[in-house]
UniProtKB/Swiss-Prot annotation:
Lineage: Eukaryota, Metazoa, Chordata, Craniata, Vertebrata
Positions of glycan attachment: N34
Sel1-like repeat extents: 107-142, 143-178, 179-214, 215-250, 297-333, 334-370, 371-406, 407-442, 443-478, 551-586, 588-623
Topological domains annotated Cytoplasmic: 684-688
SUPFAM superfamilies given in the database record: HCP-like
Position of the signal peptide: 1-23
TM spans (from-to): 663-683
Protein family membership: Belongs to the sel-1 family.
One cellular component term from this protein's GO annotations in UniProt: nuclear speck
Species the sequence originates in: Homo sapiens
UniProt record, GO biological process: ERAD pathway
InterPro entries: Sel1-like, Sel1_AlgK, TPR-like_helical_dom_sf
Key words of the record: Cell projection, Glycoprotein, Membrane, Nucleus, Repeat, Signal, Transmembrane, Transmembrane helix
Protein name, per record: Protein sel-1 homolog 2
Length: 688
């Protein structure tokens, strides 16, 4: 495995060396941007041979020194002229084991240092330093470091994306039993990225990955069995896979509050991603900071919350969060007081864990009727932190906070009734409060609802409902952080890196990632797949997103069949998908497309009246459809009128007047050309 880790070191060196050359080809506004670098096999071999020669000569010298040392020890370990071979052998084994232990310990230390640097990194340069530490640890045989390096090469985490090198490293790791490597190889096989497209092989890799405890593999298999992707659809099997992951996620949420991740849809604002509402624009953030420093209490609390959990693309920063909360609390904000209490209750880098201080701030907020403060006091009494354990007091505060609509308090009430903590068990009330909290996205409430549906506790058992709920919990795992890195990679123009990350999330069953992957593939800007494979793969992903309820994806499937993208032209199938999007999701674009097909009899029986009705429905559904519908209806009415005038009782006698023959099959475009100038003149006269 050492040659592979050496290869990684070489890639890093080459990536840093030629970074500036490649950066000039990118957008001038992006400074010091890392780019994907492909290193030729010959260059790699040359560097490898050079380093290996140095190491070989070094090994020869070491062997000679060891031999001399061995002879010296042999002379010492003699009893009355007879060599004690047993003592020598034991000594040799001990020294060898000690050397191996020291070597392993050093690799572990380097890996831990790399993790620490990576967690604290604020710039690309610092991240590269972390991966250099991982490379050194990998060279010492640290499997976790090798996994990190393989991921970095696959996703382009430190500026160099080399899928071929990543695959080589994953294959070596898989032989060592790495379930993470097996999951990665399954993913690459399922898309045909750098490997042969092979769904059967992908399924085998995922199965081995899942057996080894890899939660991504378990999620992927859960989604496949839920949807029947290359396996027989089986809800119970899907339930077993999703439950394993959901149990882990719920356990982490019980210990500490998770950080929600914004899932930006590339399909919504492809022309102006920087203004996407899911990510806070830097200029807007600076403006908010200005307002906060000027004393805007509401903005102070909002910025404090964003920094407390790291939302809208901002880094989690406890010091900044505390700074804004203290300012707002000084101005009398009950929310700010409650959040300060929460920080002291949990403890973090900015404040030490202190139950007494938490109680103080929660009490201040609760005295103002604040739901977060009331819930905080309930938690202190429920767990007996800083106050005597008192379930009755906890119940009282949770009820007050729940009445004000605080979802965490609603969950706590549900949990008390579910577990019988200080009160009689009541599954109906537990279900009621879990359901209320779940409507606000409270993750633990969703988890316990899934548990109740899976076991039939307090409700009629429903495997499908349980799986859907467990799936929602699983999608809150730390792997969802790739949504942000994928988005920023796309925004920076690193399409291949973005696609690989979205594609992995899509494989795990995230609908947003499926849509985003299909959107990128459709643009044909990626280089990691052959161009002829992009439309078929995009169609597959649009279909998976549509099955999960995405109306835009359903319209896209109709478009692909209408135009023959990635499949044969099929007007009938296109009309079917447009009809589903129009009737089930009330999608204006689908209504418009379906109306056009009825107007021209494409794949369905021609029906002018139904076409007119669908055009009207599209206009009523979406204001954006008003102008297109206006032109479409004017064209429809005009052509219909012209046909009545020109062809009524004159078809045989005046055959030469047929518009299809005189102007051509696209004569309706000619008619539109006549209508538009007339409409413009009418509008001018009207305003004049």
């Amino acid at each position: 495995m050492k040659p592979l880790s050496l290869l990684i070191e070489i890639l890093i060196i080459l990536g840093v060396t030629i970074k500036t050359i490649k950066a000039e080809e990118h957008n001038k506004r992006q400074k010091e941007r890392n780019v994907t670098t492909q290193v030729s096999v010959n260059e790699i071999k040359q560097y490898l041979s050079h380093i290996l020669e140095q190491r070989t000569s070094s090994n020869v010298i070491n062997k000679r020194e060891n031999l001399l040392e061995k002879k010296k020890n042999q002379r010492k370990i003699r009893i009355k002229g007879i060599q004690n071979k047993d003592i020598l052998k034991r000594n040799k084994n001990h020294l060898q084991k000690q050397a191996e232990k020291n070597f392993t310990d050093e690799g572990d230390q380097l890996f831990k240092m790399g993790i620490k640097v990576l967690q604290q990194s604020k710039s690309q340069k610092q991240k590269e330093e972390a991966y250099l530490l991982f490379a050194k640890a990998a060279d010492m045989g640290n499997l976790k470091a090798m996994e990190k390096m393989a991921d970095a090469l696959l996703f382009g985490n430190f500026g160099v994306q080399n899928i071929t090198a990543a695959i080589q490293l994953y294959e070596s790791l898989a032989k060592e039993g790495s379930c993470k490597a097996q999951n990665a190889l399954g993913f690459l096989s399922s898309y045909g990225i750098g490997m042969e497209y092979d769904q059967a092989k992908a399924l085998i890799y995922y199965t081995f990955g899942s057996a080894g405890g890899n939660m991504m593999s378990q999620m992927i298999l859960g989604y496949r069995y839920l949807s029947g992707i290359n396996v027989l659809q089986n809800c119970e099997v899907a339930l077993s896979y999703y439950k394993k992951v959901a149990d882990y996620i719920a356990d982490t949420f019980e210990k500490s509050e998770g950080v929600p991740v914004e899932k930006v849809r590339l399909t919504e604002r492809p022309e102006n991603l920087s203004s996407n509402s899911e990510i806070l624009d830097w200029d807007i953030y600076q403006y908010y900071k200005f307002l906060a420093e000027r004393g805007d209490v509401q903005i102070q609390v909002s910025l404090g919350q964003l920094h407390l959990i790291g939302r809208k693309g901002l880094d989690q920063d406890y010091y900044k969060a505390l700074h804004y909360f203290l300012k707002a609390a000084k101005a009398g904000s009950a929310n700010a007081m409650a959040f300060i209490g929460k920080m002291y209750l949990e403890g973090n880098a900015a404040v030490p864990q202190n139950n007494a201080t938490a109680f103080k701030y929660f009490s201040m907020a609760a005295s103002k009727g604040n739901a977060i403060g009331l819930h905080g006091l309930g938690l202190l009494y429920f767990h007996g932190k800083g106050v005597p354990l008192n379930y009755a007091e906890a119940l009282k505060y949770f009820q007050k906070a729940a009445e004000k609509g605080w979802p965490d308090a609603q969950f706590q009430l549900g949990f008390m009734y579910y577990s019988g903590s200080g009160i009689w068990k009541d599954y109906k009330l537990a279900f009621k409060y879990f359901y209320l909290a779940s409507q606000s996205g409270q993750p633990l409430a969703i988890y316990y609802l899934a548990k109740m549906y899976a076991t039939g506790t307090g409700v009629v058992r429903s495997c499908r409902t349980a799986v859907e709920l467990y799936k929602g919990v699983c999608e809150l795992g730390h792997w969802a952080e790739k949504f942000l890195t994928a988005y920023f990679a796309y925004k920076d123009g690193d399409i291949d890196s973005s696609l690989v990350q979205y594609a992995l999330l899509a494989e795990m069953g995230y609908e947003v990632a499926q849509s985003n992957s299909a959107f990128i593939l459709e643009s044909k800007k990626a280089n990691i797949l052959e161009k002829e494979k992009m439309y078929p793969m995009a169609l597959l992903l649009w279909n998976r997103a549509a099955i999960q309820g995405n109306a835009f994806a359903r319209v896209k499937i109709g478009d692909y069949h209408y135009y023959g993208y990635g499949t044969k032209k099929d007007y009938q199938t296109a009309a079917t998908h447009y009809s589903i999007a129009a009737n089930k999701y009330h999608n204006a674009q689908a209504m418009f497309n379906l109306a056009y097909m009825y107007e021209h009899g494409l794949g369905i029986t021609k029906d002018i009246h139904l076409a007119r009705r669908l055009y009207d429905m599209a206009a009523q559904t979406s204001p954006d459809a008003h102008i297109p519908v206006l032109f479409a209806v004017m064209k429809l009415e005009t052509t219909h009128l012209l046909r009545d005038i020109l062809f009524f009782n004159f078809t045989t006698r005046w055959n030469w007047l047929k518009l299809d023959n005189t102007i051509g099959p696209h004569w309706d475009l000619f008619v539109i050309g006549l209508i538009v100038p007339g409409l413009i003149l009418l509008l001018r006269n009207h305003h004049g």
